[in-house]
Amino acid sequence: MFLSPGEGPATEGGGLGPGEEAPKKKHRRNRTTFTTYQLHQLERAFEASHYPDVYSREELAAKVHLPEVRVQVWFQNRRAKWRRQERLESGSGAVAAPXLPEAPALPFARPPAMSLPLEPWLGPGPPAVPGLPRLLGPGPGLQASFGPHAFAPTFADGFALEEASLRLLAKEHAQALDRAWPPA
C-alpha cells in the first residue's frame, strides 16, 4: 500500500486537513488586581449588605471603575470567606455543650438575659404557647422513645445558626434601605 503526499498517520487523526484551522487555546482571564481604594469601597459595601442587588452592584462598579461582573464575583468570594471565618470562630469555642453561640458573634446588641434562640419557640425549653408544639428539637416523649443520642444537635444547631445569619442579613438590608431612602 502506497500513501500519497498528505496522507498517513500524521494527518489522518491529528493533522489539519485542507481548510482547517489550528484549534484555538481557551482564553484564560487574568487575575484581577484591586486597588486599595477599590478594596476599601467593596468592603464598605459588604459591611452594609452581604447580598447587594444588581443596581447596587452596578452603582458600586461604576464608582470603583470595575465591570459589574467583577464586583459580583468579588461579593461571592467575600461571602465565602465570611462563612469560612464564621465557621472557624464557631468551631474554636467549647464543643462540649450543644449550645448556640452567644450574642457577641452578632454585631447588634442584645440584652444579656437573651441568648441566641431569638424566639421562645426555637429553644429547647417548654413551648411558648401551651398546647402548641416546639418547632425545633424532639419533645420529651420522642426523646425517650428513640434514646438520648437519636437526635444529633448538629441539624438543630446548624438550622439556628443559619436562621441567625438570615436575621442578620435582613437587618443589614433594612439598614441599607434606611440609608438609601430616608423618611420624608
From Swiss-Prot:
<keyword id="KW-0238">DNA-binding</keyword>
<dbReference type="Pfam" id="PF00046">
    <property type="entry name" value="Homeodomain"/>
</dbReference>
<dbReference type="GO" id="GO:0007601">
    <property type="term" value="P:visual perception"/>
</dbReference>
<dbReference type="InterPro" id="IPR009057">
    <property type="entry name" value="Homeodomain-like_sf"/>
</dbReference>
<feature type="region of interest" description="Disordered">
    <location>
        <begin position="1"/>
        <end position="33"/>
    </location>
</feature>
<dbReference type="InterPro" id="IPR001356">
    <property type="entry name" value="HD"/>
</dbReference>
<feature type="DNA-binding region" description="Homeobox">
    <location>
        <begin position="27"/>
        <end position="86"/>
    </location>
</feature>
<keyword id="KW-0805">Transcription regulation</keyword>
<dbReference type="GO" id="GO:0000978">
    <property type="term" value="F:RNA polymerase II cis-regulatory region sequence-specific DNA binding"/>
</dbReference>
<keyword id="KW-0716">Sensory transduction</keyword>
<dbReference type="InterPro" id="IPR043562">
    <property type="entry name" value="RAX/RAX2"/>
</dbReference>
<dbReference type="GO" id="GO:0006357">
    <property type="term" value="P:regulation of transcription by RNA polymerase II"/>
</dbReference>
<dbReference type="GO" id="GO:0045944">
    <property type="term" value="P:positive regulation of transcription by RNA polymerase II"/>
</dbReference>
<keyword id="KW-0371">Homeobox</keyword>
<keyword id="KW-0539">Nucleus</keyword>
<keyword id="KW-0844">Vision</keyword>
<dbReference type="InterPro" id="IPR017970">
    <property type="entry name" value="Homeobox_CS"/>
</dbReference>
<dbReference type="GO" id="GO:0005634">
    <property type="term" value="C:nucleus"/>
</dbReference>
<comment type="subunit">
    <text>Interacts with CRX.</text>
</comment>
<dbReference type="GO" id="GO:0000981">
    <property type="term" value="F:DNA-binding transcription factor activity, RNA polymerase II-specific"/>
</dbReference>
<keyword id="KW-0804">Transcription</keyword>
<protein>
    <recommendedName>
        <fullName>Retina and anterior neural fold homeobox protein 2</fullName>
    </recommendedName>
</protein>
<feature type="compositionally biased region" description="Low complexity">
    <location>
        <begin position="1"/>
        <end position="10"/>
    </location>
</feature>
<comment type="function">
    <text>May be involved in modulating the expression of photoreceptor specific genes. Binds to the Ret-1 and Bat-1 element within the rhodopsin promoter.</text>
</comment>
